[in-house]
Design a protein with these regions (language model features):
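Active-site and donor-binding regions of nucleotide-sugar-utilizing enzymes
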Residues: 6-7, 11-132
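A conserved nucleotide-sugar
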Residues: 184
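Charged/polar, solvent-exposed surface patches and flexible loops
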Residues: 20, 83, 141-148, 181
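Charged helix-capping and loop-helix junction motifs
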Residues: 173-181
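Extreme N-terminal starter segment of soluble prokaryotic enzymes
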Residues: 1-5
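A nucleotide-sugar donor-handling region in carbohydrate enzymes
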Residues: 105-174
């Protein structure tokens, strides 16, 4: 059985995609939650291989035996994942989910979506949609759970799935209310 580390992403959408991939693999995984140092930007921007962006306790949690596979997302985690792969003597494979910030040869595999315009390369999988944990069983459970709430609403019904904040774009209560009005 392979040893898999999930380097927990710091944003909910990224975290969900990492966990969805882990769930799909069906193997046990160990989640490593990192705390980031404030005002440390250069390792991420410059594509370095370092632990400089995380605090000492987080760095101390990353020790041998090294994993066979590291799955992560987010620019802050990239230098750390490269460091893990380097410490393993190159044995740990690094899968990055979402937008890659470093050069593509920094990753063993990138699983991304079209909005990031990642070039086609042998180590890039470009999915139509983001990874998720929605299964037929979860949909059936939600249907049973929510049927009484929606039963009285007029048909046809339209569902809108919207993400959260992304960089300078925020999705607060006002934006959600406006989306609801405009979708009705």
């Amino acid at each position: 059985m392979p040893v898999i580390w999930l380097i927990d992403a710091y944003r909910a959408g990224e975290r969900g995609q990492v966990r969805a991939l882990a769930d799909a693999l069906g193997w046990p995984c160990e989640t490593k939650t990192l705390r980031y140092r404030k005002h440390v930007v250069l390792p991420h921007v410059l594509g370095r291989t370092t632990l400089r962006g995380i605090d000492a306790a987080s760095a101390a949690s990353l020790q041998a035996p090294w994993p066979d596979l590291v799955i992560s997302s987010g620019v802050r985690n990239e230098p750390v994942c490269r460091w893990i792969r380097e410490q393993s003597g190159g044995q740990a494979r690094y899968v990055h989910v979402g937008r890659p910030w470093a050069s593509l040869d920094s990753f063993d595999l990138v699983i991304t979506t079209p909005q990031y315009r990642v070039p086609e390369e042998p180590n890039v999988v470009n999915n139509t949609l983001t990874l998720h944990s929605i299964t037929p069983e979860r949909l059936a459970q939600a249907r049973r759970e929510w049927a009484p709430t929606f039963q009285a609403l007029p048909q046809p019904r339209i569902a809108v799935i919207a993400g959260g904040d992304s960089g300078p774009f925020t999705f607060g209560a006002g934006a959600a209310a406006r989306l609801g009005r405009e979708a009705s």
